[in-house]
Amino acid sequence: MRKNFRIGLFAGAFVLALMPALRLSAGPGPAKHDDNNRQEIRHVLLISIDGMHAVDYENCVASNTCPTLAGLGHTGLTYTRTTTSRPSDSFPGLMALVTGGSPRTVGAFYDVAYDRVLAPPAADTGNGLVHGNCIVGVINGTQTEYEEGVEIDQSKVNGGGPYSPFDGGVLSIDPKKLERDPFNGCNPVYPWNFVRTNTIYGVIHAAGRFTAWSDKHPVYAVVSGPTGTTSPSNVDDYYAPEVNSNVVNIPGFKTANGKDCSNISANTNGDWTTDFDSIKCYDQLKVNAVVNWIKGKNHLGTANAPVPAIFGMNFQAVSVGQKLIENGVKGGYTDAAGDPTPSMAGEIAFVDASIGQMVTALKHQQLLDSTAIIITAKHGQSPIDTHRFFPIPGHSGTNGMPPSAVLAALLPASATSGLGLAEDDISQLWLTNSNDTATAVSMLEDNGTAVGLGQILYGASLTTIFNPPGVPNVPGPCCWLREGGEPRTPDIIVLPNVGVVYTGSTKKQSEHGGFAWDDTNVMLLVSNPDIRPRTIHSFVETAQVAPTILEFLGLDPDALDAVREEGTPVLPGLFESDHE
């Protein structure tokens, strides 16, 4: 049984002498006052700075370029060896933070993946997943897409939903573009029902507390966890301006560090991720939503609402700053030590100023003492050393070929045309027939140089991490894990050499999704005025954030399905054991 935890920071040698068996912890525990009259933790602000490595945080603090983050570190625990989910894609990365689980339990491998049971959508998606038939009561098999392509109009900030121009949410999702469940009347599978486990949002909402989140796509209302309905009802206020929509001017709007967004569309003809400044304007929309929540408003600031018990957002600016090459100007890093280029440093400075706006709002509302701030990242980015970047096939098309090209004859049609596989610095391969796995592995070995092969996971090397690939013995309604094969586990995972990215683009120099250290070692900072600053060097995982949040709020971490299944502990150093 999980031990209880409590506030454990004691002042004075006298108390320590009287209680020698108690370990000195770094800060506040569950939501109750201790003898030192500390504020109870009533709110948790969770921030994912997508792409933010542990070394990025260390470097910006050392160079005095992120004063807000440095200040939070003065009242916080810093974890230097934090690893994300594997794969390190945004979808499983976010799920780790809110479920406490890995793809093995949660069932989320990538935003574009495959399910051997589900059926294709009723309409083509905006990114090219072709519609198909759904045969009731029969195993079908389809790629799964939970990104911008399932929106009504992904070119618009509001996703084409019934919102004002700069609003956005789940009503932008077109159910005709969602995969369907042949064992549930061929009904669409909404993203929050696609995942198999509950989330902190479900637990906190069930406890009668207000919840909110903001992210880059409407489908990331998946943080709700399963509801069995067409609504992610565990999230009381969800805000998702579409990051891959076309850049438009935002009149009278400025970022935290003063960038005017009134004429931002002059910078690019692309989406918000194609320009170093545009992405700041995009992220600022979400920053303003967080500030509105702190002020007791809804995300637009147009109505009163409770201050959420759990709330937060993801930043895209650092991730874009790491990858982007714009008109010959490179983001990323100047060396293998992670020293940022000026463009990359500007993205970190913007994020720092934005978090500063949140901290200022918490102070103004007298909420800082009662709020735990957790700052981490869904994923990192690889390679940090851009000299190691090697695109396959590259812009010329002559640098080699991705694994999907080598195995094209063994893959479902949807993987080689239309939407295609999501091959970044990883390749996950679902074969048409799993019995061809040995043949496929031999083909990859024979073409190892062409694919930049580092490691192949299949068979036992795969099933030590994930459930065995296959189909259930007795299939049933989505999305429970059933006896037999796992319909979502790839047959093969290719981990390329460090620096290899499967792309032909000339506008990127890194990616994420893989298992490399640069992909997975992200910053993790837990801050509150009552926490004594400390750096923890033991290995931890971002999945430990989920049970830690519940512990902060005085709720049972074992209420999370994935925590019970995987034994995910709370983060070390924060809570004091009762030593019963």
What are these regions (language model features)?
Residues 41-54, 71-73, 97, 204, ...:
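Beta-strand elements within well-structured catalytic alpha/beta cores of enzymes
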Residues 27-77:
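Active-site-proximal N-terminal segment of extracellular/periplasmic enzymes that hydrolyze or transfer
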Residues 64, 80, 87-89, 111-168, ...:
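Secreted, luminal/periplasmic, and some membrane-associated catalytic domains
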Residues 99-112, 212, 228-293, 335-352, ...:
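Acidic, His- and aromatic-enriched active-site or binding-groove loops in soluble protein domains
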Residues 218, 222-234, 297-350, 387-389:
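Active-site His/acidic residue clusters
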Residues 79-98, 214-224, 314-316, 563-570:
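Short, solvent-exposed turn/loop segments enriched in Gly/Ser/Thr/Pro and often Arg
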Residues 70, 425-467, 528-530, 538-565, ...:
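Non-catalytic, well-ordered alpha-helical segments in soluble enzyme domains
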Residues 57-110, 210-212:
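Short, structured active-site-proximal loop/turn typified by the sulfatase FGly-forming signature C/S-X-P-X-R
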